């Protein structure tokens, strides 16, 4: 039998397709009409509970067949049955705005008054605002298969802060695991006869919520996630009445790979501690910076000359997320190793203190100059730093980014001198003026 469903790129439709796949315990291409006839009754049993109906009002508005004042289980049942009856084979083209493989639905209830609008497809137009739709048509042109998939979509959502998070990814693996978690939550509600609505991890900030969900998925499912080219987009939305709302957040592939690498090197507990320290009243500064493409290097420091993770973890972040050249990363590491060796030979934390407290680029250069002189005094065979290395790799942009280079040097020095520093306690010795 030809496949019924095809992934469309429409986040609402695709979410519903993965829910159907998980509920039927079949691959998407193997789903049959008989599966749909068996599954649609579950929607009726669930959606007419108080908590789910409340969610549906903000997902589909009060004009949806399950939420309308005249809505009854029988009315919604008829709607779902007619969508299933209207399933037609896929073609090479069609007018459906989602799949493009079938023509518009012939189901009457889907086209009442204003056609297919926000009461059936969230965040689209409604009523007689025909200028919202292509060619001033009365509502969207969408086939019955895609409309049916959207009916399962709410199960895929996470409720968060009075709105909903919809995840969409280029990775079928990510979409499948996301659906698996949500369906497991639904089955739990059914088994306990305790209906609480869409899945929630009890985090009200959307950025914090979806980062935690991604991290939990990476930890829970044993995959080589750090080798996957995963891109994730989150839609944080509400389709409620006169105040629809949507914000879009992207998790780029390098950020996902970094989160996966944290698990790969068994640094997850330290990562949780790192991010746990980054919360403030506005959210989580580490997660927010990853979303904005800003550096999180400073957050790898615990304080008291201790760091989270190790150089390999930081290197992966620098290479994957910051897109720093590996030769430069290695040059900074090697310089830090030479400085660490020098400090231990001097048996003095003076230079380390100066490096920690320097305020500007000029002061930073002076610390390096003092260190270079110290290297000569103790008889180091090679120069601490060479000219070409300094201008070509350590600070190729001059003063720009000097403070991050300083932080990277300190990270490696703390790692290399961990035991030595620990034995000296919190000793601080001030030295020459910079």
Language model segments and positions:
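Intrinsically disordered, low-complexity regulatory regions
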Residues: 196-434
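Helix N-terminus capping/helix-initiation residues
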Residues: 10, 32, 143, 293, ...
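Basic, glycine-/proline-tolerant helical and adjacent loop/strand elements
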Residues: 53-203
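A sequence-composition feature that detects small, non-aromatic residues
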Residues: 3, 15, 51, 66, ...
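Alpha-helix initiation/capping motif
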Residues: 29-32, 116-118, 171, 360
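Proline-rich intrinsically disordered, low-complexity coils
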Residues: 2, 11, 65, 73, ...
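Conserved small-residue
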Residues: 1-73, 416-429
